[in-house]
Amino acid sequence: MIQRIQTVYLLLIVALGITLIFMPVLQFVTPEEAEELRIYELGASGLTLITNEDCQPEVCLQGLWGLLLTTALIPALALVDIFLYRKRLLQARLKIFLALLCLGYYGVLAIYIWQAKLALGVEWHLIPWASIPLICFVLTLMATRRILKDEALVRAADRIR
């Protein structure tokens, strides 16, 4: 199981996905013409106001269930997929779903950006953590390719016998 390179790719997806759960991916900043500078951060745990009078982070909005569910499913599916090493075709199908989920994360994120922009009237900026689903997508494609190569190798070995 661990000797296969796709397992390493899957473990990286799990580690990056767990990191994504706890890190903010967007910053919302009030426009320059506003009377007060306010900086919000958006992550899977919610929308947090970073700059306020007490300089203490304050959670403004919880219940971003779509973003939290998408973020939690990425490492969960990758972890389940590690233990399906004997069922390579099922593993490849799950990888395709995982790749779509990684791209779907950006769709869900776009919905929350649009809602926050309308509700708060702020400008948004991506934080480097926002690239994690894209990295997971690339790792998923690499793992899928290796899984399909393994399946072809096993079928070729069965024909030789």
Question: Which ranges hold each PLM region?
Answer:
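Long, glycine/tryptophan/cysteine-rich extracytoplasmic
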Residues: 22-60
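Membrane-interface helix-boundary signature
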Residues: 2-9, 60-67, 88-92, 122-129
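Alpha-helical transmembrane segments of multi-pass integral membrane proteins
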Residues: 104-161
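Individual transmembrane alpha-helix segments
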Residues: 51-88
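Select subsegments of transmembrane alpha-helices in polytopic membrane proteins
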Residues: 65-70, 96-104
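N-terminal signal-anchor transmembrane alpha helix
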Residues: 4-29
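Cytoplasmic juxtamembrane regions at transmembrane-helix boundaries
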Residues: 77-102, 161
